[in-house]
């Protein structure tokens, strides 16, 4: 499936890391804990994550993995660092930060998530007022801010080279969409 997405220029996201198969709590309504040792998870629950190719993105699960620490993975620096190390440094997006498993104001949830090292904080539910507060809490995207601080004007050749490097890192190539793909022949 992910290979098919990748061939059409769409990036898939593996979710929910470190897995939800051992929890009985729905993280929309409460915080779940996984007490299984990491070496056991590596030989069982994480095998599918390692076997699947075609993506460089992972979404966190709002669970505590007690082997790493006592914080939800999404807001845990130790957990985010462990995911990056174990799964070859993926881009990491949080699950929705309005879920009950993550506590605090929406501002605190966004700040704690980004401070833990998550690349993108997801806000997919809630009111417009909460959404606006989440955006303000996030501020300028960190990579954009860091890039802007050291930005030098680039030629179009240099920009094209940077885009090609990004495409190579992400494992995609520019695709031309067929606008008639969904029409009967």
Indicate residue ranges for each PLM-predicted region:
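Second-shell residues forming the walls of enzyme active-site clefts
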Residues: 1-146, 150-153, 169-179
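Short linear clamp-binding motif
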Residues: 166
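A mobile, often basic/glycine-rich helix-loop segment
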Residues: 163
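Long, charge-rich alpha-helical interaction segments
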Residues: 157-160
